[in-house]
């Protein structure tokens, strides 16, 4: 193991996860759950006789050159039936595409990617001749014969040939080192409030440590990889919370908690996202677990107080609502007051029972 890399990882340990207790507001991204191709109004750019592109979101910087290693997410559909047969966003694992060395069935996609900048999202139209051909593909992915395709593609970023080599040709030390550099670049961009660009760097860092790579690691190699990979997921979650994309933030926290179930930052950020979605009881459970593992954390105490205040405000609102209902029917009547307090008591009992049941279920799991 490269001793300098190990020292670098330890040196940056305190800086590896960004602090995000603020509430910057930036524009939201489109949903990552599309089952049909997006409707795009932009003019189609012809890239090849069989390939055209419509830009959904502009990128930044330069375009990749031949033999660049590109990291991207995409969804793919057959054009006629609009059957979605592949979705890398669903797996939360970007793919690697080396331009000029792509598989034959990805030739059309590669032409589209070569025309895109980092951060650009586009709808790429590919004729069957530059896709799965006359015979199609009957294993995975399942594509019928002579099928024209649609790709919704987002280029996360790319490495020029002069900067490095394909992940498969890298040693363990090189891959972890490359990922750590991307993570630190992401942290710098986050501090500048460039959230989308920061997430691209974190995604590229994660791309160096896919499931196939992590599966081969053990001992200190695994620990060093997780010390880079998990903070990237948490930092993406922090960006997504600022972008108000709460469901996606929860997904990245869940990935970390699969590896480290006692990670207080993952529990805290998941709780924060759940609270924003109105899942108060579940958010409280996450905050309390986080507090158990980080008892001195002021941010956790602050979120628990905020939840308690929200519940108190909701209780007062319900109280006033029921008062208004019964006041109209029986001004000052003893029966109305009794019924009101009976309803309030019943709601409290149901809420208490629900919490007890949830705690028992969590313990059982």
UniProtKB/Swiss-Prot annotation:
Catalytic reaction list: [protein]-peptidylproline (omega=180) = [protein]-peptidylproline (omega=0)
Keyword field contains Isomerase: yes
Superkingdom, natural source: Eukaryota
Disordered: region residues: 1-44
Entry GO MF terms: calmodulin binding; peptidyl-prolyl cis-trans isomerase activity
Disruption phenotype: Plants display helical rotation of several organs. Reduced number of small and curly flowers with low petal formation, as well as poor flower fertility due to short stamen filaments not sufficiently elongated to position the anthers above the stigma during anthesis; this phenotype is associated with reduced length of epidermal cells in the middle of stamen. Loss of auxin signaling in nectaries leading to reduced starch accumulation. Impaired ABCB1 and ABCB19 localization at the plasma membrane of endothecium and middle layer cells of stamen.
Alphabetical list of PROSITE patterns matching this protein: FKBP_PPIASE, TPR, TPR_REGION
Compositional bias per record (Basic and acidic residues), positions renumbered to this chain: 1-15
Gene Ontology cellular component list: endoplasmic reticulum; plasma membrane; vacuolar membrane
A single GO BP: leaf development
Signal peptide start-end: none
Gene3D superfamilies xrefs: 3.10.50.40, Tetratricopeptide repeat domain (1.25.40.10)
Membrane-crossing segments per the record: 338-357
Membrane topology: Single-pass type IV membrane protein
Region spans: Calmodulin-binding: 310-326
UniProt xrefs under InterPro entries: AIP/AIPL1/TTC9, PPIase_dom_sf, PPIase_FKBP_dom, TPR-like_helical_dom_sf, TPR_rpt
Coiled-coil blocks: none
Keywords for the protein's UniProt record, in alphabetical order: Auxin signaling pathway, Calmodulin-binding, Cell membrane, Endoplasmic reticulum, Isomerase, Membrane, Repeat, Rotamase, TPR repeat, Transmembrane, Transmembrane helix, Vacuole
Pfam families reported for this sequence: FKBP_C, TPR_8
Key word rRNA-binding present: no
Domain PPIase FKBP-type positions: 67-159
Primary localization: membrane
Biological role stated in the UniProt entry: PPIases accelerate the folding of proteins. It catalyzes the cis-trans isomerization of proline imidic peptide bonds in oligopeptides. Modulates the uptake of MRP substrates into the vacuole; reduces metolachlor-GS (MOC-GS) and enhances 17-beta-estradiol 17-(beta-D-glucuronide) (E(2)17betaG) uptake. Regulates cell elongation and orientation. Functions as a positive regulator of PGP1-mediated auxin transport. Confers drug modulation of PGP1 efflux activity as interaction with NPA or flavonol quercetin prevents its physical and functional interaction with PGP1.
Family in the record: Belongs to the FKBP-type PPIase family.
Protein name (Swiss-Prot/TrEMBL): Peptidyl-prolyl cis-trans isomerase FKBP42
Organism: Arabidopsis thaliana
